[in-house]
């Protein structure tokens, strides 16, 4: 079932939104186009922000628990987008992309899809998040069943779609880990563990770049074959010494910098023997990242937090790192940099503050 509904008169599910003030009227003020925000670092540039809030009403603009989801919503042009369950606990259960008025919570449209060729339970719908693009006025979403869509941001009409599991052999496992799209110039890039035929017959974490307006594939690249994990690391777009770069952790445990226009590898660092889920942080050419698995250089130690110079080329070794703290299991949460202090939350919920 693939269904689209526009401007329904009643609500069928939603999430909570805390507002700092009235939603801005200008097209780009207050936009939050991907889950880590406008600077890809988890820091809001808006002021003032509320210092306190409560789900019972303090600084709460509206609340729609029916659309609750593990997915982080995004905002563009006064509209909020997210992924959540459709018809939960029924024989028609699937997933849907919803668009609501960010100021009022009114449902504007929703697009409903089946979840198929996946072992993931329904509770893991929304592991990925919608990504919005002002230039094409589109939103992009990868569903739990690896159904990748480009939707008209105003109406929800499907502009193009790819069933990544059927076309590219993308795997959606019980863990439900699906990756986040990233928009670069005329491209939208998505990745996942894929297995196909010919040279792609062996499973590998692979990246595919599509023309964001037509859905036509532009480039396709593989990482090291037979990875241990599927992952949900979000690619970070940046530039190193004037060269555009996409920094992302792979299912093979390697942190990569790719040329986003071509997919060519700029550099790579073998951090772990298992997949990297932590979204890297890039600031002034320095890459900060972590993981909570076996270290590639010391398999008897779990986890590490590290920094490297993103302006390097080729294979990065342990000796090339700026610093590394083994044994810190920072395997889920992206670090945040404030001044010269790096704030990182480990998998046990301990907060570490590092002098960079």
What does each of the following model-derived ranges do?
Residues 9-21:
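Bacterial N-terminal signal peptides
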Residues 24-356:
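Noncatalytic, solvent-exposed loop/strand surfaces
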Residues 1-7:
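N-terminal secretory signal peptides that target proteins for export/translocation
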């Amino acid at each position: 079932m693939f269904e689209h509904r526009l401007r329904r008169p009643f609500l069928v599910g939603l999430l909570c939104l805390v507002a700092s003030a009235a939603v801005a009227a200008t097209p780009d003020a207050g936009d939050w186009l991907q889950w880590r925000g406008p600077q890809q670092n988890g820091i809001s540039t808006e002021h003032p922000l509320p210092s306190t809030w409560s789900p019972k009403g303090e600084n709460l603009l509206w609340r729609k628990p029916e659309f609750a989801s593990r997915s982080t919503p995004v905002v563009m042009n006064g509209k909020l987008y997210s992924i959540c369950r459709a018809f939960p606990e029924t024989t028609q259960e699937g997933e849907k992309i919803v668009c609501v008025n960010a100021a009022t919570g009114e449902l504007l449209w929703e697009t409903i899809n089946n979840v198929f060729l996946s072992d993931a339970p329904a509770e893991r719908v929304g592991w990925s998040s919608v990504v919005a693009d002002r230039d094409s006025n589109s939103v992009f979403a990868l569903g739990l069943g690896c159904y990748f869509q480009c939707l008209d941001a105003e109406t929800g009409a499907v502009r193009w779609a790819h069933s990544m599991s059927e076309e590219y052999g993308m795997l959606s496992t019980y863990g439900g880990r699906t990756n986040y799209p990233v928009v670069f110039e005329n491209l939208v890039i998505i990745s996942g563990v894929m297995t196909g035929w010919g040279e792609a017959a062996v499973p590998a974490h692979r990246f595919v770049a599509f023309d964001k307006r037509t859905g036509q594939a532009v480039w396709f690249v593989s990482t090291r074959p037979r990875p241990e994990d599927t992952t949900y690391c979000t690619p970070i777009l940046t530039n190193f010494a004037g060269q555009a770069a996409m920094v992302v952790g792979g299912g093979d445990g390697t942190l990569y910098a790719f040329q986003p226009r071509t997919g060519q590898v700029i550099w790579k660092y073998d951090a772990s023997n298992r997949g990297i889920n932590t979204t890297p942080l890039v600031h002034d050419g320095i890459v900060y990242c972590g993981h909570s698995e076996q270290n590639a250089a010391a398999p008897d130690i779990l986890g590490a937090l590290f920094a490297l110079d993103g302006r390097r080329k080729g294979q990065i070794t342990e000796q090339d790192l700026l610093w590394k703290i083994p044994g810190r299991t920072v395997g889920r949460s992206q670090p945040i940099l404030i001044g010269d202090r790096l704030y990182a939350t480990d998998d046990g919920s301990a907060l570490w503050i590092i002098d960079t």
